[in-house]
Every structure is written in C-alpha cells, then in structure tokens.
C-alpha cells in the first residue's frame, strides 16, 4: 500500500547535516534505477514516485524532499503501527484525510576553539491532509532559539538569517538568536500529468549538493508552481514573491518587495541522458517611476525572457541555464549545470581581456551508488565555479537573492568550490563524512570585486582585467563527520552526533577557526546547510 509521504520540512541547524537533496541514499539509487528520471525539481510530489519506492518504506526518516500526496490511502491505527517502519507521521483516529506531526530538534554542543556552548531548541507542529483525493494541504509552524558556532554566528549577524532554517534571526542576547518559521502549501493534482501548488516554501533545482539555478539556503517564500509531465518532457514554472533586506536599518518596514519567474524544462533524451533548460528573471516591486508589483508580462508560460524584456524596455535581471545528466552502469551518474547571467560572444572570444560582465558559472559532479560494490554506500564529488559579479545587478533590489541569502549557491560569486562526500545507510543507521574546500575573492568595505552579489555591479572596480578570486583571496576548508540512528518506534526519534572543523583565512588579514561537536535528537524531516 502506498504510504503517506510528508512535505519536506526546513532545516534544523546542525542535526541533519548529512541529509541528501534526494530523499535517502537508498531512495536516491532506486530513483535513478527506474524509468523515473526527472530528478532535478525538488521537493518531489509523492504520487510521482515509482511505486516500488513509494511502497518500499525507503522514505522513512528521510522525507526532506517529498511533498504530501493528495491521494492518501486509508490507514487505521492498527495498520499504522503495523506499518510503522514505512512512515514518520501520526494519523488521527481512523481518518484518512488528516495527519499531525510534531516538529522538534533538541541539540547541544561545544565549540573547542572559542570555548562556547552551542545549542538548538526548536518546537512546532505540522498539519496536513487531503480533500476528495485531488487536493492536498500542509502547514508547518515552528519557533526556536539557537546559539551558533562562530562562523555561523558571523552569517547570522551579516545576513540576518539563521543558517539552516534561513528564517530571519532576532538577537536575544550576545550569542543567542530567536526565530519563527511558517511554511505550507496547497497542492491540486487533477491527473497524473499535471499538478498546481501555491504556498510558502523552499525549493531546490538540480541534482548536485549545490545548485547554480535555485537553492534552499535562504528563507521560504510565497510562490505558485505549475508542473506538467508529458511524454519524455517535464515542464515546471515557478512564480515567486521575494524580499530585499539590503536597507541598512534592517527594519521590516524597509524590506522591499521583488518578484521572480523561473522556468525549467527537463527532457529524457535517452534512457541514460537527461537534458534541462533553465531560465529565470528577477524584478523589483518598485522603480524610480512607479510601483510595478507582479508583472503580468512574465506570466507567459513559455521560456526565453529576453524578448519580453526588450518589448517592455526593461533591464530586469534575467539569466539562462543548461543542465546535462548522464547515467551509466545503473549506479553511476554524471551531472552538470551552466548558468549564463550575461553572454556576449565578442567578449567571450576575447576571454583574456577579463570583461566584468562575463558572468557565468559551471557545476560538474559525479555520484556513485553502491560505491566499491558496498550496498548503500554513496560517493559524491562536485566542483562549482562562478565568476565575479554573476547573479548581481545594477539595482541591488534585483540581485538574484531573497532576504539575506543568495537564491543559488550560498557563496554568491567569485569563487571555486570542491566538495566530496562518502555516506553509508543501513536499517536506520547512517554515517557520513564530508570535505569542502573553497577559494573566493573577498570584498572589503568600500570595494566591490564581485563576490558580494547584494552590491550593485555599478560599483565594480574595473571594466576589464577581472579574473577569478580577484580581491582578497580567501581559503575555506571544512571537514564534517556525522553518525545517526533513527528508531522505528511509535514516536519517531533520531539521535545524531556531528563533529565539524572549519577554517577560513584571508592571508595575514583575517583568520576564523571553529571546531565543534553537536549531539541530540530530532524528527528527521528536514535538510540543512551549514557546510559553507
């Protein structure tokens, strides 16, 4: 019987650092080894999953990227407890159209470098259900208090967000932050080819650990989403209501509205080949002459926004992207993304001149499931490179950002990152190790070398002679080890232990080191980002 899959919930701070974009290691492998290969758009809708996965119980404890399925099965208390290993939610009485899940994350830790006590206390509730088999709903409410490691504290102070959750941070005292979280959505699915969603949530577009198109590192945002799957094609259109927090006061009264329209076409060209095309545009809610609001010109479901921009005399922030995914020998996947913020062939040919608006990025990655012929062992490696000034705009309000974080890679631009991971999962037990190495060109007060995408590119240092890592070259190294166990009890419980060592150095100008351990228990329904 198909189980009730939950909507993905947003990140705890340090507890579930090993969670994959895909639902679990087992599910990741099974997902790729079936005919279902539209894996880039997340979260998934559970009714889109192959039946062998939906019925197998693989999503137990790893539902980070599965949305509630409108067509919920009828499940009694007796059947629920008999099938406990297949699900992570409670059902009220005999009803098949209502579920209730507690949200909790209790963690404690210690930073060995700064001798600081770390903690994370989050509590909340998730309510979901369906109406007449075609309409599903979901609501998540939570609040928390956290004390962060020094580099995460720096992010919270600078970007006004709590790393992992992405929600706005409110300073309670010198080292603790409070935050509230509200998200949810309504899904209408009239048939197997079409689904429409409205709500407030996070999204991730890609097959890697990071995404150069759309990532989940920032705040949840209001959205409307249309997805259609026909033949070998899947088309996704996302309309988003974002915010700009760059006003110096930091007051909510100064937050400015901005909007985005994003499209993605996924084409299964062959059993082993998937090709994707991405396009997005961000525009400000007000300009110097008028209040624009949501521009209906961008409701056109067809992609290619540049002609629309030209017809309106607009200078909105539009970009184009491409992705390629190649699968071979069942358990091996190569994936890639290319993002083009600007593309002028004349300047591309004259690459060595270093024109400032050569704003592009590339991702190359490789995953191997059952690595070294060990079942449920995943190996992943990934490289991300983004040139200076990519994602930025002449108007900071139109930068490719939301709230205090980028919409794509958390480092913004002007960087190169190498990522590696080895993870093992078996019968509720998981252990993983990650290594992250980054080099970026740091901006300082009064300079703009292209790393801070919240700053207008009109303040750039030079038109020509720009290169990767320009500015104050900074090296970042992060190592992480995580072990966790999820109990198959009537009350879902996951115990985890995480150790992270991170160093960041800008020559002789700046050095920031952190080594900490975190331990605690949580309901494992989210993924988080603290590895940058």
Q: What is the predicted function of each stretch?
A:
Residues 1-24:
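Bacterial Sec-dependent N-terminal signal peptides
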Residues 6-9, 196, 326:
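Generic hydrophobic-segment detector
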Residues 21-274, 279-285, 351-360, 367-393, ...:
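Outer-membrane beta-barrel channel domains
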Residues 179, 273-532:
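Exposed, low-structure sequence patches enriched in small/polar residues
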């Amino acid at each position: 019987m198909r189980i009730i899959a939950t909507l993905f919930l947003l990140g705890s701070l340090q507890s579930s650092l090993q969670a994959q974009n895909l639902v679990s290691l087992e599910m990741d492998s099974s997902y790729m080894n079936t005919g279902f290969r539209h894996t880039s758009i997340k979260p998934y809708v559970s009714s889109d999953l192959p039946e062998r996965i939906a019925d197998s119980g693989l999503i137990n404890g790893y539902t980070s990227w599965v949305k509630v399925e409108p067509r919920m099965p009828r499940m009694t208390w007796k059947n629920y407890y008999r099938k406990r290993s297949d699900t992570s939610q409670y059902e009220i009485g005999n009803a098949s159209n209502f579920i209730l899940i507690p949200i909790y994350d209790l963690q404690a830790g210690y930073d060995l470098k700064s001798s600081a006590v770390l903690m994370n206390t989050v509590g909340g509730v998730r309510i979901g259900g369906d109406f007449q088999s075609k309409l599903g709903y979901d609501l998540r409410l939570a609040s928390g208090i956290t004390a962060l490691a020094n580099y995460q504290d720096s992010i919270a102070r600078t970007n006004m967000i709590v790393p992992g959750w992405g929600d706005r941070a409110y300073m309670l005292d010198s080292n603790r932050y409070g935050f509230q979280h509200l998200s949810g959505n309504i899904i209408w699915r009239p048939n197997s080819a079409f689904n429409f969603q409205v709500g407030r949530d996070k999204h991730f577009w890609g097959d890697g650990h990071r995404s150069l198109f759309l990532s989940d590192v920032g705040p949840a945002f209001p959205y409307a989403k249309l997805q259609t799957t026909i033949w070998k094609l899947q088309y996704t259109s996302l309309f988003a209501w974002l915010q700009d927090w760059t006003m110096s006061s930091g007051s909510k009264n100064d937050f400015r509205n901005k909007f985005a329209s994003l499209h993605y076409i996924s084409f299964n060209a062959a059993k082993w080949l998937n090709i994707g095309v991405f396009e997005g545009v961000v525009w400000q809610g007000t300009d110097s002459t008028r209040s624009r609001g949501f521009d209906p010109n961008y409701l056109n479901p067809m992609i290619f926004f540049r002609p629309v921009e030209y017809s309106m005399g607009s200078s909105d922030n539009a970009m184009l992207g491409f992705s390629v995914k190649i699968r071979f020998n069942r358990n091996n996947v190569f994936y890639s993304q290319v993002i083009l913020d600007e593309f002028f062939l004349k300047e591309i040919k004259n690459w060595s001149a270093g024109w400032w608006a050569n704003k592009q990025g590339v991702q190359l990655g490789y995953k191997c499931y059952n690595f070294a012929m060990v079942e449920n062992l995943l190996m992943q490696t990934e490289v991300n490179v983004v040139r200076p000034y990519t994602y930025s705009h002449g108007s900071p309000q139109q930068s490719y950002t939301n709230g205090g974080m980028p919409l794509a890679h958390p480092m913004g631009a002007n960087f190169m990152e190498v990522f590696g991971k080895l993870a093992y999962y078996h019968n509720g037990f998981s252990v993983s190790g990650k290594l992250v190495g980054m080099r970026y060109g740091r901006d300082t007060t009064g300079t703009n070398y292209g790393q801070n995408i919240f700053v207008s590119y009109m303040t750039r240092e030079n038109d020509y002679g720009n290169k990767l890592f320009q500015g104050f070259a900074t090296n970042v190294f992060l190592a992480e080890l995580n072990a966790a166990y999820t109990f198959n009890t009537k009350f879902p419980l996951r115990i985890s232990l995480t150790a992270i060592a991170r160093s960041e150095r800008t020559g002789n100008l700046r050095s920031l080191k952190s080594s900490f351990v975190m331990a605690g228990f949580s309901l494992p329904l989210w993924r988080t980002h603290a590895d940058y």
